[in-house]
Amino acid sequence: MALRFPRFSQGLAQDPTTRRIWFGIATAHDFESHDDITEERLYQNIFASHFGQLAIIFLWTSGNLFHVAWQGNFESWVQDPLHVRPIAHAIWDPHFGQPAVEAFTRGGSLGPVNIAYSGVYQWWYTIGLRTNEDLYTGALFLLFLSAISLLAGWFHLQPKWKPSVSWFKNAESRLNHHLSGLFGVSSLAWTGHLVHVAIPGSRGEYVRWNNFLEVLPHPQGLGPLFTGQWNLYAQNPDSSSHLFGTSQGAGTAVLTLLGGFHPQTQSLWLTDIAHHHLAIAFIFLVAGHMYRTNFGIGHSIKDLLDAHIPPGGRLGRGHKGLYDTINNSLHFQLGLALASLGVITSLVAQHMYSLPAYAFIAQDFTTQAALYTHHQYIAGFIMTGAFAHGAIFFIRDYNPEQNEDNVLARMLDHKEAIISHLSWASLFLGFHTLGLYVHNDVMLAFGTPEKQILIEPIFAQWIQSAHGKTSYGFDVLLSSTSGPAFNAGRNIWLPGWLNAINENSNSLFLTIGPGDFLVHHAIALGLHTTTLILVKGALDARGSKLMPDKKDFGYSFPCDGPGRGGTCDISAWDAFYLAVFWMLNTIGWVTFYWHWKHITLWQGNVSQFNESSTYLMGWLRDYLWLNSSQLINGYNPFGMNSLSVWAWMFLFGHLVWATGFMFLIFWRGYWQELIETLAWAHERTPLANLIRWRDKPVALSIVQARLVGLAHFSVGYIFTYAAFLIASTSGKFG
């Protein structure tokens, strides 16, 4: 018999129905379930695929550089970053005739182009790139790295160069190398780039391979380093009148602690950033020597974990047994990695706008909005993935004997208390927040806005004041001019920080009021409910009172027939599926809040947000409806404009989103009947019946249909909001 897809599963390959194709795609990356898999091959396959992943990333970033160099306007943007619109790439085939060509010919280009809202122009400019040649050089270098990655992946699939399982399970060596090598050395190298190339570039010096050995980054060279006079590197920083990219107002300092923002670029001081990376490098280089390997110095992680037993004896055996549990479970390791990466991605979203690191990016409002939204959605998907793999760990890898009475076992033992507390928190937040919004809605509807319940977020305002925000009048810690912390830091970093935090032209510690109080609690509701669903899915993954043998059914099962009295929708996969809807919903509220508050700040009418955000109709009318008007007007009797493409994407996003419900509401029987009718018609239609297929068409399984529905819902949801966000922001601010 000819080899059929999927090669990794003979059982599936012999399936006579279309289930073969869909189940084959669904399990292609579940290496553990493949025929003939061994632990060694599993680790080697994953290791080799990482190189392929790197190759794709390098190819993609190379493409960004290449297209901007070829079709962009980087060199003219560099001359005037605040007024020239950065071009991402040309549009090859602008449909809809001459009006489209005219609408999309912008940014000083000769033909139709797409504008870049990714921030790459600001990033490349900040790190010292200035010409198209620089961009081409970078693109070629990344292409080279991509090729090297592919070769490395192939190389490590050859029998002689396949690492052994013991190599993959050497946790101490891996941690040391990742901490010192990946984080430490790369941070040190980045500090070097900033000091040798980017900082001179910001002062009008063009440093490249041909002259970087001759241009001293600091007038005194390495002298202060070797004589211990490190403070010399911080003396004579750039002045507040410094023009970025020129020597006007420039200083000579390379490692500073100024605090606050560069007045012209509204971004963090480049010398502060270099100092930060040097400190990070030092910490990680030290951290990479913490764990004991062949050299007999440092800690054994197993010893550390086994010693972590709570004193008093009432909290069980602590971390005993965790080392082998984690080290032998790829799902546990992936869960930890995804949880960490999810948190850091969300923190990136929060910090990119509040503490912008790239020159002039703070004044590019559409880019700010796009980057915040982009990173929050990615964080959401990564975090839900962490719980998915945590649940798979409990089903496939958890060994009760090995983890007796340790923290994992105790989580399972106390799951009812954990889940019910989360449930209580979600119910409390939901009913109270909705109650306040609905009450305020009714008061406005009846023309008595003064009867709204408006709660000042005094605790959050107090925290902002403690960090130096003076407008609330709390006079506490850094907002108190007589405090010891204020006086101690006055000559170091505080002037820049206090100026920044009390200046209303940036997004640092925004002034908050009753509208913020309400939406924060709405977001808290979303976060707690998403967490509740995910935690319940993972803690009940092995079994529950309703279905004690659940782990025997695997991660995703539809149900165990009608005889068990309701075993549908309780697999760990179903919890993940439900949680993704809540995650999207929550991030919707987060991005709505961020965007509306910033639009009113940028337009100088912040009172609109303050007055309209305290009741639901305000959100619907003054945020969603008011800002979608440009989209709905993308096509009109007078032809088209540069927002037309977003108007189309807005419509298309709604279409994709709505298609999701078709899969989520109609299940197998409906589709099976429809398929059989269509197959009957096909076989009796002349010409059409010349085309035959080998696999008998059958409907998707319940779980697969849910996945397809969820995918359409998610993609449509994000497409729709992306179009709304970019069009409403760029329509106002260009």
Curated annotation (Swiss-Prot):
Transmembrane segments: 46-69, 135-158, 175-199, 273-291, 330-353, 369-395, 417-439, 517-535, 575-596, 643-665, 707-727
Domain of life: Eukaryota
GO MF annotation list: 4 iron, 4 sulfur cluster binding; chlorophyll binding; electron transfer activity; magnesium ion binding; oxidoreductase activity
Subcellular location, record wording: Plastid, Chloroplast thylakoid membrane
Gene Ontology cellular-component annotations: chloroplast thylakoid membrane; photosystem I
Binding site for [4Fe-4S] cluster: C559, C568
Binding site for phylloquinone: W671
Catalysed reaction equations from the record: reduced [plastocyanin] + hnu + oxidized [2Fe-2S]-[ferredoxin] = oxidized [plastocyanin] + reduced [2Fe-2S]-[ferredoxin]
Keyword line: 4Fe-4S, Chlorophyll, Chloroplast, Chromophore, Electron transport, Iron, Iron-sulfur, Magnesium, Membrane, Metal-binding, Oxidoreductase, Photosynthesis, Photosystem I, Plastid, Thylakoid, Transmembrane, Transmembrane helix, Transport
Pfam families attached to this UniProt entry: PsaA_PsaB (PF00223)
Residues the record lists as binding chlorophyll a B3: M662, Y670
Transmembrane found in the keyword field: yes
Topology of the protein relative to the lipid bilayer: Multi-pass membrane protein
GO biological-process terms attached to the record: photosynthesis
Enzyme Commission number(s) of this protein: 1.97.1.12
Cofactor comment text: P700 is a chlorophyll a/chlorophyll a' dimer, A0 is one or more chlorophyll a, A1 is one or both phylloquinones and FX is a shared 4Fe-4S iron-sulfur center.
Residues holding chlorophyll a B1: H654
Top-tier EC class: oxidoreductase
Quaternary structure, from the entry: The PsaA/B heterodimer binds the P700 chlorophyll special pair and subsequent electron acceptors. PSI consists of a core antenna complex that captures photons, and an electron transfer chain that converts photonic excitation into a charge separation. The eukaryotic PSI reaction center is composed of at least 11 subunits.
Family note: Belongs to the PsaA/PsaB family.
Function text: PsaA and PsaB bind P700, the primary electron donor of photosystem I (PSI), as well as the electron acceptors A0, A1 and FX. PSI is a plastocyanin-ferredoxin oxidoreductase, converting photonic excitation into a charge separation, which transfers an electron from the donor P700 chlorophyll pair to the spectroscopically characterized acceptors A0, A1, FX, FA and FB in turn. Oxidized P700 is reduced on the lumenal side of the thylakoid membrane by plastocyanin.
PANTHER family associated with the record: OUTER MEMBRANE PROTEIN, OMPA-RELATED, PHOTOSYSTEM I P700 CHLOROPHYLL A APOPROTEIN A1-RELATED
Protein name as it appears in the record: Photosystem I P700 chlorophyll a apoprotein A2
